[in-house]
Amino acid sequence: MSVSNEYKLVVMGGGGVGKSALTIQFIQNHFIEEYDPTIEDSYRRQCQVDEDTCLLDILDTAGQDDYSAMRDQYMRTGQGFLCVYDVTSRTSFEEINVVREQIIRVKDNDKVPIVLVGNKCDLENLREVTEGEGSELAKSFSVPFLETSAKKRLNVDECFFEVVREIKKSLKEPGRSKKDKKGGILKKFKGGDCLIL
């Protein structure tokens, strides 16, 4: 089985939302019970996404509040992002706007491949964020949305595969426009770049 594509995925979100639990469940098929704050961990997994054999290079990052100096660097190198919040934490859900804005600022592109992930959906009795709220936020961002449970292994593979699909989709879009620093749109015309303000 030869690998045709390699993708760099970055898992982002607040501290304690289950980024490491999701990533380790995806890579090693087991659930980590104890919370040990991550600085930065990198994992690789070869897998089949639709018809393609892919090598996923996954960066499990520190929570939003920690280690912000490294954040811009891994946002620059990432191709696709899982923006994870905890359905039992309204605060982590509200932080997602900031996470997305940081990604868009660093990538200088508002069409970055992102999947919104509401983790810990097995803790229904502690839920603070409804599935409908997650779905509405994803719709406002124009990104896919999944609720997951790292503990029960619900939608774990699917959320990573969905990011790969979003990356593939973005790579197929010809001449995607990019916002410049002043808010204009750069478009390719014969003879060079033009700035439309």
Swiss-Prot record:
EC number: 3.6.5.2
Motif residue range(s): Effector region: 35-43
Protein keywords: Cell membrane, GTP-binding, Hydrolase, Lipoprotein, Membrane, Methylation, Nucleotide-binding, Prenylation
A Pfam family reported for this protein in Swiss-Prot or TrEMBL: Ras
Reaction(s) catalysed (UniProt annotation): GTP + H2O = GDP + phosphate + H(+)
Modified residues (Cysteine methyl ester): C194
Prosegment location in residue numbers: 195-197
Localization per record: Cell membrane
InterPro entries cross-referenced by the UniProt entry: P-loop_NTPase, Small_GTP-bd, Small_GTPase, Small_GTPase_Ras-type
Binding site for GTP: 13-20, 60-64, 119-122
A GO molecular function held by the record: GDP binding
Function noted in UniProt: Ras proteins bind GDP/GTP and possess intrinsic GTPase activity.
Designated name of the protein: Ras-like protein rasB
Organism: Dictyostelium discoideum (Social amoeba)
Gene: rasB
